[in-house]
């Protein structure tokens, strides 16, 4: 399907140009480690973080009550918990003094203020829907928080993975989005420009600088030049192969669970038609894309939850690649060669995402669609998606741990800003099953309800599932200590270091 040579030729053509452009740039201080990003975070306020970069960097700046293990199960982080009744959970902050980076102690009052802020409709947090069943929060002691919920929910602790903010700063409407104050392993230093963000490791003072380099070829060239020390993901496989065979660079690969999909505006007269969405599903040769474009570094997906998830469904039947069936479905919806189904397809301006969009466009056009690709810078693109200004788009969900994502993305009332149901999907059976799953105390019944939700979603196609992408990390040979996570977070920065730096 694709030839790797054009990308490599592009690399060599750009090498001369880019080396000339950056030759005047000084190498970074050895005291700073630079991490190359495709896109910068939208916000550093954990109450609003829904994009990948924001979520991953917020994990470094803030502590949260709970985290998740490799089996997608909630485990204690800042606090351990007990279920006193099916509607009452008590959390104890773990031993030791917890302090925010401004020196203030972290107590149960801060936990209470954080979640009450998320629950406050005036905050307009997109995370509100996941904790909306909290009826009250009490703080019987400085290290104790009681959560009361209106219905039993055995997954409730896992929904509290939101970074904790200082209560006094919440009251003063502190701009956490640009000047975060947390208690995590890293503290905020500066955001001097839109393409540069610095944080500092609390334990040893190591500074990490995130540098936005949207073009993947330029990002690789900066890595080779030493202008950045490491990067993760958002590279075409040809560049990954190139780095793997380049001296002085270390490359790690890891299976991932980040879910890429096509999303639709279901109020649109074209893609709002089920037959059209099913035609799209049958027109896409996902197996060929994962084999040739990703070089096997992605797996086809049938649902937002991977089959390995405890609520995932490995028995979901995929939409086979069947161009003839796609044409027949289009005909049944009233489209033909004289009257093609016209779709505007929005994507980010990242070259690899544009390349994928072009391949999808070609496959759809072959069966009778007329697809117009519109690519935008990340801020404009993501703003359009959140605001519902789209007909069709492609995006990825990252860091999914709990099946509560099904409520966030598909429940009828989870339309932004109350959630992430951006396509305005409505299905009474899905709503009922999600409510039933949330209210049962039987984990087996809960898993069965969520699997049925996923079967309905695959049938109704508010999303067309595409694939789970693997993770790739590349660093200069003097960088060590970084371990990749299955969800692609940046927690490896907690231990990363330059091997010739003092103390290593």
Regions found by a protein language model. Name each.
Residues 26, 370-381, 408-477, 504:
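Extracytoplasmic/peripheral linker and loop segments enriched in polar/acidic and small residues
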Residues 37-86, 116, 181-182:
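N-terminal lobe/hinge region of extracytoplasmic solute-binding protein
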Residues 195-241, 370:
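Ligand-site clamp/hinge motif
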């Amino acid at each position: 399907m694709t030839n790797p040579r054009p990308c490599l030729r592009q690399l060599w053509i750009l090498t001369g140009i880019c080396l000339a452009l950056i030759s005047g740039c000084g190498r970074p201080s050895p005291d700073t480690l630079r991490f190359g990003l495709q896109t910068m975070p939208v916000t550093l306020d954990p109450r609003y973080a829904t994009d990948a970069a924001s979520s991953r960097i917020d994990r470094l700046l803030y502590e949260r009550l709970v985290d998740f293990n490799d089996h997608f199960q909630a485990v204690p982080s800042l606090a351990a918990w007990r279920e006193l009744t099916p509607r009452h959970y008590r959390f104890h902050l773990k031993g030791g003094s917890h302090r925010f980076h401004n020196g203030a102690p972290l107590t149960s009052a801060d936990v209470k203020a954080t979640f009450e802020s998320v629950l406050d409709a005036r905050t307009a947090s997109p995370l509100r829907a996941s904790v909306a069943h909290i009826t009250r929060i009490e703080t019987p002691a400085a290290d104790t928080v009681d959560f009361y919920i209106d219905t039993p929910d055995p997954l409730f602790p896992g929904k509290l993975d939101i970074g904790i903010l200082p209560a006094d700063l919440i009251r003063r409407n502190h701009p956490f989005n640009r000047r975060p104050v947390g208690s995590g392993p890293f503290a905020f230093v500066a955001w001097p420009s839109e393409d540069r963000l610095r944080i500092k490791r609390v334990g040893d003072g190591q500074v990490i600088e995130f540098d936005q380099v949207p073009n993947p070829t330029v990002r690789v060239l900066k890595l080779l030049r030493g202008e950045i020390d490491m990067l993760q993901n958002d590279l075409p496989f040809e560049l990954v192969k190139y780095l793997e065979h380049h001296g002085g660079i270390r490359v790690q690969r890891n299976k991932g669970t980040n879910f890429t999909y096509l999303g639709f505006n279901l109020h649109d007269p074209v893609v709002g038609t089920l037959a059209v969405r099913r035609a799209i599903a049958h027109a896409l040769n996902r197996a060929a894309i994962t084999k040739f474009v990703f070089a096997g570094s992605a797996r086809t997906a049938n649902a937002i939850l991977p089959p390995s998830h405890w609520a995932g469904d490995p028995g979901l039947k995929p939409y086979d690649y069947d161009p003839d069936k796609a044409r027949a479905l289009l005909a049944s919806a009233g489209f033909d060669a004289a009257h093609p189904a016209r779709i505007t397809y929005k994507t980010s301006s990242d070259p690899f995402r544009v390349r994928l969009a072009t391949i999808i466009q070609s496959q759809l056009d072959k069966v009778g669609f007329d697809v117009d690709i519109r690519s935008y810078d990340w801020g404009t693109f993501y703003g359009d998606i959140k605001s519902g200004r789209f007909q069709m788009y492609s995006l990825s969900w990252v860091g999914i741990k709990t099946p509560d994502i099904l409520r966030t993305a598909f429940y009828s009332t989870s339309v932004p800003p109350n959630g992430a149901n951006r396509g305005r999907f409505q299905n009474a059976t899905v709503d009922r099953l999600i409510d039933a799953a949330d209210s049962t105390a039987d984990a087996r019944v809960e898993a069965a309800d969520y699997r049925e939700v996923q079967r309905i979603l695959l049938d109704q196609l508010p999303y067309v599932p595409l694939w789970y992408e693997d993770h790739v990390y590349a660093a200069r040979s003097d960088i060590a200590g970084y371990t990749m996570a299955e969800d692609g977070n940046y927690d490896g920065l907690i231990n990363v270091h330059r091997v010739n730096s003092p103390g290593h």
